[in-house]
C-alpha cells in the first residue's frame, strides 16, 4: 500500500504549504 502511505505524507506536507501560499 505505497499509495496509502504517500497520500497522507504528501497531503500533510502540502497542506501547510498550500495554506501559506493561499494566504500570501
Curated annotation (Swiss-Prot):
Record flagged with keyword Membrane: no
Record-given protein name: Attacin
GO CC, alphabetical: extracellular region
Subcellular location: Secreted
Similarity annotation: Belongs to the attacin/sarcotoxin-2 family.
Primary subcellular site in the record, as a coarse category: secreted
UniProt source species: Heliothis virescens (Tobacco budworm moth)
Swiss-Prot/TrEMBL keywords: Antibiotic, Antimicrobial, Secreted
GO terms classed as biological process: defense response to bacterium
Function: Hemolymph antibacterial protein.
Amino acid at each position: 500500500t505505497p499509495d496509502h502511505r504517500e497520500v497522507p505524507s504528501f497531503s500533510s506536507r502540502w497542506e501547510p504549504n498550500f495554506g501559506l501560499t493561499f494566504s500570501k
